[in-house]
Amino acid sequence: VKILIVEFITGGGLAAEKAPESLAREGDMMLQALLAELNALKGLECAVMLDWRYQNNISEQTLTKIIVQENENFYQVLARTLPDYDVFWPIAPETDHALAEMVRLSAEIGVKCAASCLSAIDLCSDKLATMNVLKSVLPVPETRNLTVFTPEFPSAWVVKPIDGAGCEQTILVSDRQSYRQCLAEIDRPEAFIAQRYVAGKAISLSVLFKAGQAWLLCCNEQQIKIDDNHFVLMGCRVNSAIDHLASYHNVIDAIARSIPGLWGYVGIDLIEIPDRTHTGKHQLRVLEINPRLTTSYAGIQAATGINVAEQVLQLFDGEPDMTRLRNETVTLKL
């Protein structure tokens, strides 16, 4: 089986412009982990597309490398490369419809794609639309488009791109001065949302989905700091938070039913807060759904022994084997 792996940032999606360093680091971390897992499997012939600046990031001799030069159009290179492969595995942010465009292209060319269906990707690429779908089945923070947002202080709010990835342009607004500073940074308010700030533990769920079913790989604790009102992802503790497994399963089952087009690996960001009325209990708020590999993925095999790539490919023909070989916490630093 010939498989083409393309991570958007390091794979040439921004070949003609400066790539954001934080997203390039995260992208490279996910790409290296995916290639290592695929390399451990028999019967696969792997190729990877690489931005001309990142072509030396991959040292694996058995891989085919397709280099995207500075003057080349990323989607044209992808379109002429895809027909040579049986399976396409995109890793891309939802930003500017990058993930959707890559999946759409593979569908047009007729190459099997290790990703959610386009309708699910389009929905999850719009954080406001996602919250509107989920709010009838799960607790979510109040979310509004920035164009119709009137700040109500002393409540704090988080302003972020409607299609953002990572912590890019994610800003805490807690008073009128910080709100004015926030607006001064933003070119297109219609492309941003304001979400009521929920103080608590930032966690993410790593999940496999298929046809309305969900399998929990692990729960992770995200290490986020706020620097000059900007959120910064410092790293994550993979397979760390296992206090509330039943609640996590309820969340992923509700999401699977609400968005049955989710397929393969998906990351779900939540905030976990203590329940003040019940000692020892907690509440969850779902913040967003990322229909793609997330940074936490890079530590899952070390933490659990599960080869996630193998189980995703297994989804084409059946169900994944979630048997753990170990149960450890792995810390990833960014």
What are these regions (language model features)?
Residues 48-144:
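Conserved N-proximal alpha/beta basic substrate-recognition cap immediately N-terminal to
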Residues 196-261, 272, 276, 290-316, ...:
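ATP-dependent carboxylate/phosphate-activation module, predominantly the ATP-grasp catalytic core
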Residues 118-202, 209-214, 235-249:
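Active-site nucleotide/adenylate-binding loops and adjacent lid/helix of ATP-dependent enzymes
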Residues 1-4:
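Extreme N-terminal starter segment of soluble prokaryotic enzymes
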Residues 87, 277-280, 310-334:
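Peripheral (often C-terminal) accessory segments that flank ATP-dependent C-N-forming ligase machineries
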